[in-house]
Amino acid sequence: MNQLPERLKKLRERKRLKQYALSVRCGLHPDAVRRYETGESNPMPDALISIADELGVSTDYLLGRTSYPYMVDIPEK
């Protein structure tokens, strides 16, 4: 199941951003976030990275590959 639309909308609303504002902040077409949230289309990898960075979460979280929203840095030994 594609969790991107639901997670994207929830995170965007939590940040109190309009769809248009998030699209512009990420350098995307003004309708891009709306299309992603409705499932009309999926973001290209570079757009997904921009959105994740702007919302402060990992791309894996947006895609539903993990239930942890933040990346964890594990120091090398």
Annotate each language-model stretch with its function.
Residues 1-14:
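A short, Lys/Arg-rich alpha-helix, primarily the initiator
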Residues 31, 42, 71-72:
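Short Asp/Glu-rich motifs
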Residues 63-77:
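Short, charged recognition helix plus adjacent turn
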